[in-house]
């Protein structure tokens, strides 16, 4: 989960290339959910391109954001940056993982959770 106004999100993006390599090696897909407001949509594509964000991207609607709040039991809004882990069945395994800047600790957490 990220947004165009989130400076910590962009700090984490700087660690993305190593994360992409790990995910590819382990056959794991990346899905980015942008929780920007509609007025920010013009910043969305340039931010994806400028930060070399490989993977799938969704600019979330208000309805999706509400569903995320319910799923994560955070009625006042979800915090970002945030990394969720789902298994191959689409089940939420980790509602909040370590960050890409944590490197190997994140990779170990992912592999352990998907066993």
Language model features by range: what are they?
Residues 11-51, 64-70:
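Structural microenvironment flanking redox-active thiols in thiol-disulfide oxidoreductases
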Residues 45-80, 84, 88:
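Short, internal strand/loop/helix patches
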Residues 1-10, 16:
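Short active-site neighborhood of thiol/selenol oxidoreductases, capturing the structured segment around
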Residues 5-8, 37-41, 65-67, 92-93, ...:
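Flexible loop/turn segments at secondary-structure boundaries
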Residues 1-3, 33-36, 60-61:
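Active-site-proximal beta-strand/loop segments in catalytic clefts of secreted hydrolases
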Residues 9-12, 37, 61, 76-79, ...:
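Active-site-proximal structural scaffolding
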Residues 80-115:
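Thiol-/selenol-based redox modules, centered on thioredoxin-like
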């Amino acid at each position: 989960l990220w947004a165009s106004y989130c400076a910590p999100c962009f700090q984490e993006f700087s660690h993305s290339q190593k994360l992409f390599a790990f995910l590819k090696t382990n056959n794991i897909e990346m899905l980015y959910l942008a929780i920007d407001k509609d007025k920010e949509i013009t910043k969305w594509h340039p931010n994806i391109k400028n930060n070399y964000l490989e993977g799938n991207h969704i600019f979330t609607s208000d309805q999706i954001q509400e569903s995320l709040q319910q799923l994560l039991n955070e009625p006042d809004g979800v915090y970002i940056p945030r990394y969720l882990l789902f298994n191959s069945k689409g089940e939420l395994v980790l509602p909040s993982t370590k960050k890409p800047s944590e490197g190997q600790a994140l990779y170990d957490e992912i592999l352990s959770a998907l066993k």
